[in-house]
Amino acid sequence: MKRLNLHAGLVSASLIFFLLLAGCKSTPAGRPVDPLELIDAESSFYIAVPKNADNVLIERIITGFYEQASESDAKMIAERVNKVYCGLNRSKRSMEVQASIDGNIPRKYLPKLLNGKNGWVTSDYTPEGSLENYKIYSGQIEMTFPSENIACIGRNLEGMLDKFDALSKLPADDSTELYTDLDSETANYLKGAESEIRFFAKNPQSFLTILTGAQLDLKLIDVKGNFETDPKHQNQYLLDLDFLFKNGTFLKAGKTLLTLAFGLTNSQEEIIGDTELIIRDIRIDKQQLYKLLSI
């Protein structure tokens, strides 16, 4: 496992997207594997970024972590990406990333990019009990391409390949929607991201600090929510947040702090039961999300 610094972090992103098809073998006959199924439960923050929600964000991921990518290259690559799933663990000096990417990229870029001259080291990996052999490419970031439409990057690639190999051998008519290490509610929530960016935070403190600019001790269990581009202000998102507090007392105190931090009105808030607070239509600058992702 490699721990990535912030800008080697998510990627040599343009390489990842260029090579989404380039490094792959044919998908074995059997059940199609969903990219989300390869994300494990060891991250503290999860985000699903569909192309339809904010193509510019995907371009920013590319150019922010692979400086050699031109603006035109980033646009071309982003057009071939359908959705990015990421699990993140942040510290003061680094970000640990696990990503599974759904896309469609031509094979012709492989010989030009994944070679020793460009600083890449190739190794082979065969899951226990399998006859399949997978290539792992190590450079600024580790990556692998288990199928024609999936790229995996970052943490625990061998575990992701183990999962892919096992799932791809299931019968093609297997009706199970998702085999996931995440709890079903979180997985289905992320899977449903089509026209909006969705996230789930098991450790939401740093997330809230970036959004509000304040250190808020809210005694939370978790936070989930979504970002959509504000149709009236293309440089802003409308953000919905769903807070789960440890108890009702913490909810009341947290509601007061959040009202002040976001400048909320009563019409934007809804309390469900004793511990859940939903806040809708918070207007934030897109740069705040880019900062959260360090791009």
Predicted segment positions?
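Short secondary-structure junctions
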Residues: 117-129, 264-271
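Short cationic amphipathic helices and targeting signals
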Residues: 47, 94-103, 149-154, 237-246, ...
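Leucine-rich, highly hydrophobic segment in Treponema pallidum outer-membrane-associated proteins
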Residues: 190-295
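C-terminal motif of bacterial Sec signal peptides marking the signal peptidase cleavage site
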Residues: 21-23
